[in-house]
Regions:
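Ser/Thr/Pro/Gly-rich low-complexity linker/stalk segments immediately outside membranes or between
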Residues: 26-47
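N-proximal short alpha-helices
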Residues: 24, 28, 89-90
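Acidic/histidine-rich, surface-exposed loop or edge segments in extracytoplasmic proteins
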Residues: 36-39, 92-102
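A cross-family detector of function-defining hotspots
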Residues: 40, 45-87, 99, 107-155, ...
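N-terminal Sec-pathway targeting helices
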Residues: 1-19, 26
Length: 164
């Protein structure tokens, strides 16, 4: 009988610890990933979910993906788009090394990273990458969009946005 009572208390204590651990994980996950509205974020008048003008873009048939086509702008080959094969809508954009194109927030490649921090919400996560690069990550939970801004020495090097 004493053995049964001892096991009962052990089971209750283990259950309480697991419940508190799960609660702590949920609270930390929601606190770390605060929301930023990215549904209207544009690079050169294009946003996630829009259709592209195929006359301005060329498709890369050498890149084979199951669900997506890869396009780049004819005039700006460093502006790359991922387009859903079924819907024809943009699901991802990447801008690298092209200082002519800018976002609707009035920043572009080569600008100071403080422009990004001022124009966007303070709801970002900063990560250190290799070779001195860092990234700012903005998450839009409602529209399921992620924005990555890669920078080095406080200068924007890459802008990437895509559906989660």
């Amino acid at each position: 009988m004493k053995l049964f009572k001892r096991f009962k208390w052990i089971i209750v204590v283990v259950f309480m610890l697991v419940a508190m651990g799960a609660l702590l994980l949920i609270v930390n996950h929601n606190r770390l990933h605060t929301n930023t509205n990215l549904s209207n974020f544009k690079i050169d008048k294009l946003k996630i979910g829009s259709k592209i003008n195929k006359h301005k873009f060329e498709r890369h048939d050498d890149v084979l993906l199951k669900k997506f086509y890869v396009y780049s702008m004819v005039d700006h080959p460093d502006f790359i788009l991922l387009v859903n094969k079924r819907s024809g809508k943009v699901v991802g954009m990447s801008l690298l090394n092209d200082k002519d194109l800018q976002t609707n927030c009035n920043w572009k490649i080569g600008d100071d990273i403080s422009k990004v921090k001022v124009s966007m919400d303070a709801n970002y996560k900063e990560k250190s990458l290799h070779n001195g690069f860092k990234s700012l990550i903005f998450i839009d939970k409602k529209h399921k969009i992620k924005l990555f801004i890669v920078h080095k020495e406080n200068k924007i090097k890459k802008i990437e946005i895509h559906n989660k």
